[in-house]
């Protein structure tokens, strides 16, 4: 089928239309929410990262330079995205807890040297693995990715990269968890190396200060607004008592609870997480990262995603799907406003004028949050990607192809 001429012109036309819609949404978005006297009751002064012409043009230039585009596998593997979406949904129907680990895998991959599937590589005689970095020891869902990759290889051997597979699987995980859809370009290539040392030091810890978190996101091009929106993924998944017990019993080595914790919530948590003499600050991140992770139990799990220490109580971050799927994200921000954030790094979002502003905005306007979260996930999923000859397409996501 021809459209306004040949295929290349059609692709350019579609790209311009998509960018125009994307920009128009943000103009409407700015008009509705970034003016004084908003529905959120917050006077917004920070500019959207998409507000000015320079950013709009830079997005267009990036598309011109990039090998990424929509429907990249249209000819080489036309059913690729459908296969990935169906596989994640089929697994979700059996194991609903599959979504948070896949979303967390995406973050832990993209945050370290970009979205190149390096987090999926196993160690071998010559290379270390990011899986062995302490922040990644609780990562789950590798077997889910392997299962989907196997399906793709049966249909289109050696075509779909693990990096594309992971970003598309994470998008489907967001959808089944009640989050928004967002369009993704494809054409990423896989890294031939892993970056364990970077993963060890760059992934934010659960007790990281707000300044450290914002600095690490800023280094990767995310402003406060986008960073806060990504934290909304903490409205699903689980975390272990081990990783916040110090807030209940020995905050900052005072022998007392964190004074910022809501008193009623504190008592609720103490009931679920009784005191033990080993209570101290965790040395590794919890099963909730940015985004969160891990199924709440192994009883419904057919993919080996064990919940770590079975003797350690866990907290359901959705609080039994409080408010329903339509409150994906917003329930998290509302609880922060009530001083009911589990991690210090969560509650600290209320400790800065700018981040608090966005917490309140997202808590009061689910549509605003869903738009912002979708845009931030698009940005995260395209961070520092490998394209063209810079990467490879692995046939097994855990093993790099031999270098020529």
From Swiss-Prot:
Which species is this record about?
Arabidopsis thaliana (Mouse-ear cress)
Under what name is this protein listed? Putative Peroxidase 48
The entry marks the following residues as binding heme b, namely: 234
Summarize where Ca(2+) 1 binds, as residue positions: 109, 112, 114, 116, 118
- Paste the cofactor note: Binds 1 heme b (iron(II)-protoporphyrin IX) group per subunit. Binds 2 calcium ions per subunit.
Catalyzed reactions: 2 a phenolic donor + H2O2 = 2 a phenolic radical donor + 2 H2O
Protein origin, superkingdom = Eukaryota
Explain the purpose of this protein. Answer: Removal of H(2)O(2), oxidation of toxic reductants, biosynthesis and degradation of lignin, suberization, auxin catabolism, response to environmental stresses such as wounding, pathogen attack and oxidative stress. These functions might be dependent on each isozyme/isoform in each plant tissue.
A single GO molecular function, which one?
lactoperoxidase activity
Miscellaneous comment text of the record: There are 73 peroxidase genes in A.thaliana.
Its subcellular locations are:
Secreted
Residue ranges annotated as compositionally biased, kind Polar residues, are: 296-307
This chain is glycosylated at 136, 250
Name a GO CC annotation attached to this entry.
Answer: extracellular region
